[in-house]
């Protein structure tokens, strides 16, 4: 199961899952995706 946490360092509107995932890597998460409100959420197994 995936747990989600909003990115602390992502700035601006999230339009690219790739950019979001890159920022999440710097926050020690394995990945991330944009949600419907254009925010970046980092994901990890929980």
Curated annotation (Swiss-Prot):
This is Defensin Tk-AMP-D6. The keyword Lipoprotein does not apply. One of its GO terms (biological process) is defense response to fungus. Plant defense peptide. Belongs to the DEFL family. It comes from the Eukaryota. Keywords: Antimicrobial, Disulfide bond, Fungicide, Plant defense. The keyword Disulfide bond applies. Disulfide bonds join 3-46, 14-34, 20-40, 24-42. It comes from Triticum kiharae. InterPro entries: Defensin_plant, Scorpion_toxin-like, Scorpion_toxin-like_sf. Pfam families: Gamma-thionin.
């Amino acid at each position: 199961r995936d747990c989600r946490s909003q990115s602390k360092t992502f700035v601006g509107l999230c339009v690219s899952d790739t950019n979001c995932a890159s920022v999440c890597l710097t926050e020690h998460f394995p990945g991330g995706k944009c949600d419907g409100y254009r925010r970046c959420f980092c994901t990890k197994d929980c």
